[in-house]
Amino acid sequence: MKAFKLFKTYYSYIENKVVKEPFWAEVLKKDLVKLLDDTETKLKKENVSYMRVNDTTLYEHTEYNGVILDFTFTIEEVTI
């Protein structure tokens, strides 16, 4: 069965490598696109740096206690 999964990709300073982990799963792609839309609206209100690459990819740039945190959220089709 086909479904869609939202993955979060970031650089882990603890593991010293790029980590790609499943973040959310849905059967319908439109539900995940809506989730990214809602996230984009929230980031805009909170004045967080972000870039919506396309309807399936959102990039977020944040700084926390002097540490730069970059997250990329991507929707991918998976078989379950």
Stretch-by-stretch model annotation:
Residues 9, 15, 36, 49-51:
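Enrichment for repetitive, rod-forming helical segments
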Residues 1-7, 28, 41-44, 51:
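Short, intrinsically disordered low-complexity segments
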Residues 17-33:
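A short, exposed loop/beta-hairpin motif centered on an aromatic-Gly-Thr core
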Residues 1-21:
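Short aromatic-glycine-(Arg/Gly/Cys) micro-motifs in beta-strand/loop hairpins
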Residues 38-80:
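Short, mixed-charge low-complexity intrinsically disordered segments
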Residues 11-15, 32, 80:
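Generic "edge-of-domain/loop-turn" microfeature
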Residues 4, 25-26, 69-71:
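Extended low-polarity, hydrophobic cluster-rich segments
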Residues 1, 22, 35-37, 45:
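Helix-centric, low-specificity signal for extended rod-like, repetitive segments
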